[in-house]
């Protein structure tokens, strides 16, 4: 909660607890406005934002022991993007074009499908959800040409790939069983890759 509060201050009051909760807890973290079926609830947190009070439930997915050899490869585009600015951009877009709200609903449905696949150890299903999510995010205009190139380069060697974070720059992530090939593909596009095992542990106090 302290880390989330610090991030919110840096992002001018707009920040979800996703990054800080994942870094602290490790594994597979699900951040939602409520407890999510099929997950284990850990704690709740809230934040006063320029748009009003926000509340989140922090949940985790206990991965099956036979999940297999799966990796996440992050690709940094080299361009930063303040979360607050991108959140405001999407809010303004939906305000001007209310029909775009269906993309937000699509992302919610895709996320639930991906969560079901992850809980069952279905990596192919999870990858399909990631691909579909990226397309919806593109329609919300939060992707960039660089992120799209990195995602496209990673997909032939991945189960799925999408932008991660607020968009507008920043990073993409690919789910793969061949992290070396994906890292090479990201580097060819000018991105900087980082590999981590799916379900890695969070912060450890030494």
PLM features: residue spans?
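C-terminal nucleotide
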Residues: 4-14, 20-162, 166, 173-206
């Amino acid at each position: 909660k302290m880390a989330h509060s610090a991030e919110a201050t840096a992002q001018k009051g707009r920040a979800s607890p996703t990054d800080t909760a994942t870094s602290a807890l490790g594994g597979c973290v699900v951040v939602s406005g409520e407890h999510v079926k099929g997950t284990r609830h850990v704690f709740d947190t809230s934040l006063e934002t320029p748009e009003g009070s926000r509340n989140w439930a922090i949940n985790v997915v206990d991965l099956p022991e036979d999940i297999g050899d799966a990796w996440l490869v992050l690709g940094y585009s080299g361009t930063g993007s303040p979360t607050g600015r991108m959140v405001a951009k999407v809010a303004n877009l939906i305000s001007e074009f209310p029909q775009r709200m269906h993309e937000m609903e699509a992302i919610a449905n895709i996320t639930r499908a991906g969560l079901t696949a992850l809980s069952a150890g279905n990596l192919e299903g999870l990858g399909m959800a990631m691909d579909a999510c990226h397309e919806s995010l593109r329609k919300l205009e939060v992707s960039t040409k660089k992120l799209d190139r990195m995602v496209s380069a990673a997909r032939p060697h991945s189960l799925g790939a999408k932008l991660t974070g607020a968009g507008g720059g920043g990073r993409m992530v690919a789910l793969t069983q061949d992290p070396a090939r994906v890292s090479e593909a990201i580097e060819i596009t000018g991105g900087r890759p980082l590999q981590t095992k799916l379900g890695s542990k969070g912060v450890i106090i030494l």
